[in-house]
Amino acid sequence: MSTLSFNNISTEVLSPLNQFEIRDLLSIDALGNLHISITNIGFYLTIGAFFFLVINLLSINYNRLVSNSWSISQESLYATIHSIVTSQINPRNGQIYFPFIYTLFIFILINNLIGMVPYSFASTSHFVVTFALSFTIVLGATILGFQKHGLEFFSLLVPAGCPLALLPLLVLIEFISYLARNISLGLRLAANILSGHMLLHILAGFTYNIMTSGIIFFFLGLIPLAFIIAFSGLELGIAFIQAQVFVVLTSGYIKDALDLH
């Protein structure tokens, strides 16, 4: 039994996929068949929301003349996302949807950064989270388009200057492309976070095996260790870039729904 337990532990440490496994942190059997549990993904999403509130509280100036570092950082992110939204949509309508898009950016960014902490959990590496976001956003943009334009919203599927003979084929292609937004938006975020964390896990295990093989190999292992540190910095950049790409595409989908192009 102990050997089996030892083998299970070894498999968990060496497998790069086990870090993404959803586990119950707290499980309660309530009345009847009712089962209440807190999973690691729910726990870390809650932590992300908590950090979001804390950061906003820390950025409040309380009528101080000189802004603190938290406030300056928040204002920089605010200005960046505001510029993206107003340029993608337009200055007037962009103001309406900016609070949602800014909150979406901070939510994704914080959860991406939490996933970079060792022994934590990358919530945005799970397709159930990213697809829930992407399906909701595309559905909301579609409802917005129908609410504003009615059946004229279907003109979004008709390319400008399309020959009449090719119209059925091109409309079908545009329709499939529109439906693919549900998948591509969430897939891009989860795949980038997932692949980066898997590569870091594999490189870390490889470096650990080298550095524990002897004194000579310990110094040789400093080379891949330096690469891991550099790659971790790159992953931090990817955490910001993927959050920004997500909101840029979201702004584009809202613009398509509003302007039909």
Curated annotation (Swiss-Prot):
Care to name a GO molecular-function term for this sequence?
A: proton transmembrane transporter activity
Q: How does it sit in the membrane?
A: Multi-pass membrane protein
* Xref: CDD domains: ATP-synt_Fo_a_6
Q: Which InterPro entries match?
A: ATP_synth_F0_asu, ATP_synth_F0_asu_AS, ATP_synth_F0_asu_bact/mt, F0_ATP_A_sf
Q: Which GO terms describe its biological process?
A: proton motive force-driven ATP synthesis
Task: Report keywords, A-Z.
Answer: ATP synthesis, CF(0), Hydrogen ion transport, Ion transport, Membrane, Mitochondrion, Mitochondrion inner membrane, Transmembrane, Transmembrane helix, Transport
Q: Which GO terms describe its cellular component?
A: mitochondrial inner membrane; proton-transporting ATP synthase complex
Q: Which residues cross the membrane?
A: 38-58, 96-116, 126-146, 153-173, 191-211, 214-234, 235-255
Question: Where is it mainly found?
Answer: mitochondrion
User: What family classification does the UniProt entry report for this protein?
Assistant: Belongs to the ATPase A chain family.
Recorded protein name is ATP synthase subunit a
Q: Which organism is it from?
A: Neurospora crassa (strain ATCC 24698 / 74-OR23-1A / CBS 708.71 / DSM 1257 / FGSC 987)
